[in-house]
């Protein structure tokens, strides 16, 4: 019985309370016109305070230069028409009224990119008995954010959210930053429990300030604005693993062409051009990520262009080395200055030990010379003489010649005289045989000399190849370090505004 009585009393009080709140709302909205600004006089200015709470930095689209954020925007103002005496309504000092029924300061995001100026959801407005209005609607904003691509992917960006009154000027509405404990909240508020960390960007500074456009007058709606800044720094680990590291490793392969023989110019060019094509693909991937701007070139783009230039130089070097290595005495003459420079001077500083073949006669290197060239020379000589004069075996038998080492000791004087007569008669044939032998010996010597000079050209090609290897290695290493260290030293400033020693943090 007692419980039933208590339940009836509670229900009666709740119904009475609901009736009182309903009566209050009916009284407040009875003669209320939401189209009229709540100004007591013509010169009365409505103070509108703003506070931005960031819950999620969703993304930054570099290609479209658009920042997407999830925020709660806190707007406060005073509407004298919505005030009441709490004693007349059983102590009710707060009511919740749908925002569609009230006058709202039309504060919108000015620098949006999708045409959505308004909030995502029109929540109820908290109305206090003194006329104070508190509105906290959620919003997902896509605002413009000019991208500085110079140090991509070691960059930081300065994005902003600009809020203005769409129709009211400074004589009617005064935009201000929210205040707590008598101090302006000059920063974007972040609740650590509700904030979701972004995997690509880190928030370094989040100041807020009111800005005046002194080129205009207070009669212009663009004269005053509230700007919330987001200075964010990129986390480069993703790009280091997926773009920079593969690019550096592939680009370093171009230096390996110098470990191939100097005469393997075709294989060297093939490897260099393959690396060049791979770098072109990486450059295409970078172009798909950064905005299409001609103001700056991204850091990774500079590096790719640099290594492409180095690869092109290496291809040119391979062609030059191949041209030098295949030179012969018939096409090029090897001067003593060139021989001294490339076979005597440079090898000392390149760590090479070369000994030109003609400069070391005391230690002749074993050669494997083909007899085919000698046979060709002999045939050339045979073609110059009648065949009958060179067939010594038949002439020996036909004229009664005998080998001296087979002659016995019983040769008489007459035989000796006949022998001298026969030798005198056959002197031209013997002379021709000697000339043939001399011709073959001369041809063999010329072939050996030609082979020695060919070998010197090959050695010169090796020296050029080794010198270009060290040049390419130094150029590649220094260029890589210089370019990426430039990005490493691109740090976010300690203070958000130059010349202002405040960090704008709570």
Swiss-Prot record:
The chain crosses the membrane at residues 236-260, 269-287, 303-324, 467-490. Residues 1-17 form the signal peptide. Residues 325-466 are cytoplasmic. GO terms for cellular component: postsynaptic membrane. It catalyses: K(+)(in) = K(+)(out); Na(+)(in) = Na(+)(out). Residues 18-235 are extracellular. The modification Phosphotyrosine is found at residue 381. SUPFAM superfamilies: Neurotransmitter-gated ion-channel transmembrane pore, Nicotinic receptor ligand binding domain-like. This is Acetylcholine receptor subunit gamma. The lineage of its organism: Eukaryota, Metazoa, Chordata, Craniata, Vertebrata.
């Amino acid at each position: 019985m007692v419980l039933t009585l208590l339940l009836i009393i509670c229900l009666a009080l709740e119904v009475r309370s609901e009736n009182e709140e309903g009566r209050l709302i009916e009284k407040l909205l009875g003669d209320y016109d939401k189209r009229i600004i709540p100004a007591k006089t013509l010169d009365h200015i409505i103070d509108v305070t703003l506070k931005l709470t960031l819950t999620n930095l969703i993304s930054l689209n570099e290609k479209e230069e658009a920042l997407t954020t999830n925020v709660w925007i806190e707007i406060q103002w005073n509407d004298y028409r919505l005030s009441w005496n709490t004693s007349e309504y059983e102590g009710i000092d707060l009511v919740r009224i749908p925002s569609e029924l009230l006058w709202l300061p039309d504060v919108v995001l000015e620098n949006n990119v999708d045409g959505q100026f308004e909030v995502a959801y029109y929540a109820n407005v908290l109305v206090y008995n003194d006329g104070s209005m508190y509105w906290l609607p959620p919003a997902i904003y896509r605002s413009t954010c000019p991208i500085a691509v110079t140090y991509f992917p070691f960059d930081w960006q300065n994005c902003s959210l600009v809020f203005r009154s769409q129709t009211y000027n400074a004589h009617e509405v005064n935009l201000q930053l929210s205040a707590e404990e008598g101090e302006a909240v000059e920063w974007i508020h972040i609740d650590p429990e509700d904030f979701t960390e972004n995997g690509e960007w880190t928030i370094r500074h989040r100041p807020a300030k009111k800005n005046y456009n002194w080129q205009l007058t207070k009669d212009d709606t663009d004269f005053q604005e509230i700007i919330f800044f987001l200075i964010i720094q990129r986390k480069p680990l993703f790009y280091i693993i997926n773009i920079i590291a593969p690019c550096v490793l592939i680009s370093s392969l171009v230096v390996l062409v110098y470990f191939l023989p100097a005469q393997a110019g075709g294989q060297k060019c093939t490897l260099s051009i393959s690396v060049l094509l791979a770098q072109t693909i990486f450059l295409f991937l970078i172009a798909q990520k950064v905005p299409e701007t001609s103001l700056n070139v991204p850091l990774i783009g500079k590096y790719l262009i640099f290594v492409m230039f180095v690869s092109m130089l290496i291809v040119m070097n391979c062609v030059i080395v191949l041209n030098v290595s295949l030179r012969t005495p018939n096409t090029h003459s090897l001067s003593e200055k060139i021989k001294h420079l490339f076979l005597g001077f440079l090898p000392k500083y390149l760590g090479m030990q070369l000994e030109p073949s003609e400069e070391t006669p005391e230690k002749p290197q074993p050669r494997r010379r083909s007899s085919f060239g000698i046979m060709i020379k002999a045939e050339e000589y045979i073609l110059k003489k009648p065949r009958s004069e060179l067939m010594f075996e038949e002439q020996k038998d036909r004229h009664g010649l005998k080998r001296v080492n087979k002659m016995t000791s019983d040769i008489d004087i007459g035989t000796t005289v006949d022998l001298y007569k026969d030798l005198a008669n056959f002197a031209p044939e013997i002379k021709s045989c000697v000339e043939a032998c001399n011709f073959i010996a001369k041809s063999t010597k010329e072939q050996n000399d030609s082979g020695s000079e060919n070998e010197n050209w090959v050695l010169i090609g090796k020296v050029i190849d080794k010198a270009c290897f060290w040049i390419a290695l130094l150029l590649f290493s220094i260029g890589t370090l210089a370019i990426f260290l430039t990005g490493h030293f691109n740090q976010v400033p300690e203070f958000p505004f130059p010349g202002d020693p405040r960090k704008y943090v709570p």
